[in-house]
């Protein structure tokens, strides 16, 4: 297009050059404003400014058109103009992508003849409109556009183009983009027929954006009659074909009716009848000339394209009374407002200057024509489309100018607001730039002086850390706020250290850093088996945990509680689990903890405030998914003035809540759901019930002798030899010695005491070897100690202190000839006299003594129950029951229940046995220093009382456990494995337990059950048959016959004497 402008100037055709330059400038500026309007809310101000500049600059050239210099414009096809994408309002057209060269060549070959034909048609039309003159100097044979008189005042029917953003005003260019193929084809047909005209009307629904309408109610009835001045073909970013064109509105028109719509054309095509819509319209607009020839309407081809076609009529202004005071006042105020606006907006000022320079040659003058002035004001304004449409529809020039003045006032307000914002922004930018320059200069000065700024270094460190981390959105916001706050604090301020420490903790946590979980079942099993012997329940649970994670693709955090006696390996199995899962291990103990701040941290305002143990764990492990072992959770401190730690753990150990664990120090949620928590406890009785419900409990029982032997051989002995420096020595601790060690020295459920005794044995062996080899480790040449006094009584500064820089001794190589065998007989030399000299307290139990089984936090153990007569049976004795042995409330109730049951049972089985009528019984549980309680001694106490009542000793190799009801039902108990281990350790051969525990017995390992005869009792009769099955009814009735005969005789004698 620039080429055409230059060529027009060479030939001296100034009018044509002015017209082309106006079209070119208007198209570019209107298109730039349209592009800015698509940038969203953030570019609203820029779009508004661009729109105003576009409309205002275009108006300068529009005035020349109205003055006769140029009206209308030539329709420039794609091949007639230089590539320029500024005419497209919505998206800049671009060459189609993704097509091969051959397809492009084929399309160009097909399109070239059509375009040449269109060029010839357009040039011929221009030549006809301008009288046939053509520019001669490089004009390419193109003629001038038609003059004002050649713009048609009326067409029978024209295409209707809906506008979505704002209405068009006469005399002001507008860039429009269409996508509908039918509309594009129709426009091309108009250009080929040299009818570059259409009607543009504003859509009522702003959300709609389409190129055709089906109902006249979809648009406002008043629009403009516009000329297509240039077009450009292309595709948008989505690959759709598009046509950009620049419209020049000539006058206001009113849409009278719709002749054709896409919907009507589609229906007509479906009916495919001869008297269809298209044919009917052809006949309607076909006239016969005087010579009898038929003449077609030049725009009737639009009826076949499927676009919206309508009939228009001019929308003329009402007569203007130029002597009206109101009109003159409005004109004056509008001009003054333009003057004010030009003083604020430099762009508007340049536009008005350009208008003033040419206004003298234009008729009518825009500053003297209220109608043109109102259109100019509305055209350069950015307002609501409906309000602008109201200005377009107003026929009364005075009212139109008044409405346009409101828009100009708004523009002034917006310009003033923009000016204010610009000044404030410039002030802030200048201040920031000044501060930045001064800060950089200060930094340079300090660097030259060798003075390092601690605050800047800390901020740089925090920023460097933050770049390597993946902060969550809420943490990133807090970090930025605190870092900005730190940069504004002086190093001497108290808040400086608080904020610095807070940022240090935030950037020290492993945000977005996690260790890679290990999903190999074989590898995990190997790690667990190598570290621990037994513990099959725990190992199976961990392998199940890994298997689920492998199927899901991730291992979720869990809360596991390991419960068992001391020394069974609860803490060490936690370390093995972390190795099996390839997770970092962290342990902390909560035993005796009574301050909730240890869990959730202190408030940041306190001096020396720190986060809780969990945040420390994340910082130490540097992963988001460590394994944290909370040790001794059953020994948490009780509620006090410092809070309840157990309640603080409720949030942490709840899988549904620990995603947003809130540490008091950090004061923002931290995701702990990826952490695997393993808790340890010796008993469940002291763990709060709400806390216990949140954990998956796995019970670890004590070890039997065979398991302890294996653990000692595989783990304890090699570790003890290594720790005592006897790794290569020939020291042999035989299996028999280990068994003797367990029998005589270590009868606990775990192996902690066994480990201590083995270490003691090897320490004694190390001493014996060193003494046997007679090794003298005294230094060969030790410096003599001298005490030389200085002559003047002052120390000599040049004197150097004496030092003994002897080399470190090398490990001793023990000869192979040194050999020590530790046998059961020689254990006394290493460990002293045996602690336990017998398997049981009673090798032969008297009547009333029964071996019971108990389960404590130390594991299973035997508990004897003894019953004796407090005084001989006599006529003066009264029945009673006394119990001792530090029995708890539950065992006291069990003793009273057993006493009542025994009386009932004896009266039913042996009615003539009157023992309980006169017996004052004392029931005792040995080891009175140890508190005893629990619901599993019922059958043991009843058996002890019945043994005393029948005066029959029981088999010392029978052990029993189980609770008893008043009617003789044997109830289920817990700790069957631990009690079985204790029975076997004490030499029992028969074990009696409730029948409901039979499933627990079946689950026991074979080596635990080996050598024991199980008796599952449902009622006490089953227990009685095992203990007293050989007692006949006669024997049971006559046990105390002699004593009661004596009592009866004594009573008879006493009554006869009275």
Curated annotation (Swiss-Prot):
What EC number(s) has UniProt assigned to this enzyme? 3.4.21.53
Quaternary context: Homohexamer or homoheptamer. Organized in a ring with a central cavity.
Q: Which reaction does it catalyse?
A: Hydrolysis of proteins in presence of ATP
- Which residues are annotated as active site? 936, 979
Which SMART domains does the annotation name?
AAA, LON
Q: Which residues bind ATP?
A: 564-571
GO BP term (any one): chaperone-mediated protein complex assembly
Any idea which UniProt keywords this protein has?
Answer: ATP-binding, DNA-binding, Hydrolase, Mitochondrion, Nucleotide-binding, Protease, Serine protease, Transit peptide
- Residue span(s) of domain Lon N-terminal: 158-412
- Tell me its family: Belongs to the peptidase S16 family.
Sum up the protein's function in the record's words.
ATP-dependent serine protease that mediates the selective degradation of misfolded, unassembled or oxidatively damaged polypeptides as well as certain short-lived regulatory proteins in the mitochondrial matrix. May also have a chaperone function in the assembly of inner membrane protein complexes. Participates in the regulation of mitochondrial gene expression and in the maintenance of the integrity of the mitochondrial genome. Binds to mitochondrial DNA in a site-specific manner.
Matches recorded under CDD domains: RecA-like_Lon
Range of the transit peptide = 1-47
Q: Where in the cell is it found?
A: Mitochondrion matrix
Question: Which residue intervals define the domain Lon proteolytic in the entry?
Answer: 844-1030
- Provide the primary localization: mitochondrion
Q: Which residue ranges have biased composition labelled Gly residues?
A: 129-142
Q: Where is this region: Disordered?
A: 72-151, 778-814
The entry's protein name is: Lon protease homolog, mitochondrial
Compositional bias of kind Basic and acidic residues = 78-97, 106-118
**GO cellular component terms given for this protein:** mitochondrial matrix
**UniProt GO MF annotations:** ATP binding; ATP hydrolysis activity; ATP-dependent peptidase activity; sequence-specific DNA binding; serine-type endopeptidase activity; single-stranded DNA binding
